[in-house]
Amino acid sequence: MGETARLLGMLNLAGADTAINCWNDKYYWDFWRPWNAIQPTDPSWTPLFTAPYPEHPSGHLCLDSAHLGVLQMFFGNNVSFGVTSSRFGGETRFFNRFSDPLEEIVEARICAGLHFRTGDEQSVTLGGNVVRYMAEHYFQPVGNH
C-alpha cells in the first residue's frame, strides 16, 4: 500500500508541477496555432479541434510526458500495456514501453492541427525535465521510523 501511495503522489506532483510550468510557458510565449498559419493560404483547410489558448507548449504532451516518465521511473521502461479509447469505439492501442506512446501523441496533435512539431517536442522535454527534477529532489528515502 505504501508503494501505491508513493506512485500516486509522484504522478500527482509531477502533473501539478508540469501543468504550472506548461501554462506559464504558454502565456510567456503566446505562440499562434497552426490554423492561424494555414487558413490564410488554404481557406478550405480546417483543424479537427480548436483551443482558446496559445499553442506552445502542448499541455497534453507536457502531462503525458510527465506521467509516462513517472511510470517509467517507478516500473522501468519495458512494460507492455494497452490504452482503450472509450470515445472511438473501444479501440485499444498496445505499446511495449512507457516511452512509446509519446511519438504517436506528437503526430496526432500535429495532424489534428493543434500544434507545430517544435511545440510538441519541447513539451515532451518539459515534462521529462520536471520528472527528472522530481526524482532528484522529492520522494527521497527518509529512513525507518
Predicted regions and their residues:
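Hydrophobic alpha-helical bundle signature of multipass membrane enzymes
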Residues: M1-H145
